[in-house]
Each structure stands twice: as C-alpha cells, then as structure tokens.
A protein has these predicted regions:
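A glycine-/small-polar-enriched, mobile loop at the entrance of the PLP active site in fold-type I
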Residues: 1-9, 13, 18
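Conserved PLP-enzyme active-site core in the AAT-like
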Residues: 20-184
Length: 184
C-alpha cells in the first residue's frame, strides 16, 4: 500500500531509523518486534516498570510460546549480566515508563545490552520523536503505539516498529539465525 509506505518512511525519518513497519496497534508492534528475534526456549530481559499491557504480554502471553521474561530494575543496568544467558535475545524498555513516568537512561541500557551482544528495543510511545529520539542514544529498535500521542487524539489505532540499522545481527548469527542466515 503506497499510503502505508509513506507513513512508514515518515516515522522512520522522524526517529532517524533506516526503515519502519506499520502495525495495527502498539501491542502488535511490541509483539512483532519481540517474536521476530525469539522462539520457544528463549528469554528476554525487560525493565520492570512497563505499561500494563506490555507487562501482561511479556509475563503471560509470551510464556505460552515458551518465551521467558526476566524483569530488572530500570535504574540498574549494571545488573544486566546477571540475568543474561545463552538463550537471552533482547533487552526491552520504555523511554518514559507508563504509568510511573520514570525516565530511562537509554544510553546506559543500550551500552549494557550491546556489551552482551544484545539489541536494545525501546517503546517510545509516551515521548514520541518530538521529545526523544532513542536511536540517537543507542537504541536498536524503537516501537510506538501511534494511537496515543503520535495520533494526538486516540481516534484511530496503530503502531510502528523502527529499525535503527545499527545492530550487527550477522556478528551474532548464532543468537539470531533468523536475522543473519538464509531460510532453510
């Protein structure tokens, strides 16, 4: 759809990413971003101050797919190595956490994630690219529920996933075969 293509290109440009994917909802954006790099037996690490819908997705729905979510204090990126193992696939946070409204140190979390060979995926729904561009602070993937602040009035539903283009999936092909190797 050319209209969707223009929408995706504009969101990618606003975030400073190389491309974007429009989704039906913000929950779909989060789900696609996570399921794209995980599978049964894998785990993710998420900052503990999450939007309730994302918390339910990570703690209950993903469990049905055999994916574990480990929670971490958003003020302690130095604790990340203790939660990561060979089956960890990503670190997830929110720029401004909903509903607590704590602001996450994106640079510190991106650095901690990258040191362990993991992408840092961040939900920037509350901040929008007008207030914060997480890619400029090291985030690898940015997700949005465009229903809220980007849409401005909540009369339509939508979501988006933006790829920064800076995570080297091929360097970690053992951890991300679906991103770094051809289909079998």
């Amino acid at each position: 759809n050319p209209t969707t293509g223009v929408y995706e290109a504009r969101i990618a440009a606003m975030e400073g990413g190389i491309g974007a994917l429009a989704t039906a909802t913000g929950a779909a954006a989060v789900t696609y971003a996570v399921l794209n790099v995980t599978g049964a037996g894998d785990n993710i690490v998420a900052l503990s101050t999450l939007y309730g819908g994302t918390f339910a997705l990570f703690m209950h729905t993903l469990k049905q797919f055999g994916i574990e979510c480990r929670l971490i204090d958003p003020d302690r990126p130095e604790d990340l190595p203790g939660l990561v193992d060979e089956r960890t696939r990503l670190v997830f946070g929110e720029t401004i956490c909903n509903p607590k409204l704590n602001v996450v140190d994106i640079d510190a979390w991106a650095e901690a994630s990258h040191a362990l060979g993991l992408p840092f995926i961040i939900d920037s729904t509350v901040a929008t690219p007008y207030l914060c561009r997480p890619i400029e602070h090291g985030a690898d993937v940015v997700v949005h529920s465009t229903t809220k602040y980007m849409g401005g009035h909540g009369t339509s539903m939508g979501g988006a996933i933006v790829d920064a283009g800076n995570f080297d999936w091929a360097a970690h092909a053992d951890r991300f075969p679906m991103m770094a190797t051809p289909d079998a």
